[in-house]
A protein has these predicted regions:
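Extracellular glycan-targeting catalytic surfaces
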Residues: 1-152, 163, 230-231, 239-330
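Hydrophobic anchor position in alpha-helical repeat solenoids
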Residues: 66, 79, 169, 222-225
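Amphipathic alpha-helical repeat scaffolds
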Residues: 71-72, 167, 171
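A short glycine/serine-rich beta->alpha loop
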Residues: 98-99, 155, 208-209
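Extended amphipathic alpha-helical interaction segments
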Residues: 134-147, 151-165, 172-174, 179, ...
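Long, repeat-rich segments with strong aromatic
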Residues: 175-176, 180-265
Length: 330
């Protein structure tokens, strides 16, 4: 672990009187009796409810926010029951799950990584070590697969999939405090900006899907990656890629839609047949006008990188998600 004591997920008992903290502690307390439901594989990408292991995967992935809540509650209260629950859940998951390196299936592991980062000092040595090995496998596996992909990169190596890979790389590297992994991730972050974000700020996913839903789904993980590496002297929000693109420009491109100045009918000209299947199945958000409030988390994350985004974040969602309000870098 790096010598830095200012983890990228910070929270202290002094914040336990915060209304968001009280709400989170109450929720975590309700879940203290819950047991983990680890699976060796999760798979929801490209499938609909009740197909394959979709339903089981959704149920199992609910463990991740439970362990993050417990980790936050431990940091707020130092009640060892919460640390013990995180330890139990982490041990179960990292001892069972085999990474598939499908970033859409694995994107929700971000909450597991946050749980480890928050509760690391309260874990048993065995769980701490096996989780570190798991996170290293995750980071190195995603980096290695990107580097081995056929050049020039295309398809899922330049769309939202790669943004989710970058997030998992960055969060794992930061949780480990491994500066060499952070530098490798930084290189791939800039590569993704060059491949995914146009100089005007529009993204590959909007061109392909004709949906602002996918702009948000593409930018949220890149923003999370930037938050993760901030304590290591990395400032990725306005760093320019080789084509001049920046993460900030992509967020700013979305802003006229997020603030209501412009509207967009979703998926009308999507090139992906699965989008129509989801609309036909009645899944919410896959037809009709885009809902700006769905970008609330993105703008709250962006506000952690630049407070100028906060007024719009507050319009979209009155408060940040509690985990972000309590522990993201301030």
């Amino acid at each position: 672990m790096a010598s830095s004591t200012h983890d990228w997920r910070r929270v202290s008992p002094a914040q336990s009187g915060d209304p968001a903290a009280a709400k989170l502690i109450a929720r975590a307390t309700e879940h203290l009796g819950q047991t983990p439901h680890p699976l060796p594989r999760l798979h929801t990408e490209g499938t609909l409810p009740h197909q394959g292991i979709y339903d089981e995967s959704v149920v199992a992935a609910r463990d991740f926010p439970v362990m993050r809540d417990a980790a936050l509650a431990w940091r707020l209260t130092r009640d060892k029951r919460f640390a013990e629950q995180v330890d139990t859940f982490l041990h179960a998951w990292v001892g069972t799950y085999v990474p598939s390196f499908n970033p859409i299936d694995e994107t929700k592991f971000d909450a597991l990584i946050q749980a480890y980062t928050l509760a690391r000092d309260g874990l048993t040595p065995g769980t701490r070590e096996e989780t570190q090995r798991f996170l290293r496998t995750l980071a190195e596996g995603y980096i290695g697969r990107t580097d081995a992909a056929r050049q020039p990169l295309s398809h899922t190596w330049i769309n939202n999939w790669q943004s989710h890979r970058i997030k998992l790389m960055a969060m794992s590297a930061a949780a480990l405090g491994d500066r060499a992994l952070i530098e490798q991730t930084h290189r791939l972050f800039l590569q993704q900006l060059a491949n995914n974000v146009r100089p005007d700020g529009s993204v590959e996913d909007f061109e392909d899907r004709d949906a602002l839903h996918y702009v948000v789904y593409d930018l949220e993980p890149l923003t999370m990656a930037a938050i993760a590496v901030q304590p290591f002297g990395q400032h990725w929000l306005r760093e320019r890629a080789s084509n001049g693109a920046t993460l900030a420009a992509a967020i700013d491109w979305l802003t006229p839609y997020a603030d209501g100045s412009r509207t967009h009918e979703e998926y009308v000209h999507s090139h992906v047949a699965f989008d129509k299947k989801r609309a036909d199945a009645g899944l919410p958000g896959f037809s009709g006008l885009w809902e700006p409030k769905s970008a609330g988390t993105l703008y709250w994350q962006a506000a952690r990188l630049d407070p100028n985004y906060r007024p719009l974040a507050e319009r979209l969602a009155a408060t940040a998600p509690d985990w972000l309000a309590l522990c993201a870098a301030r």
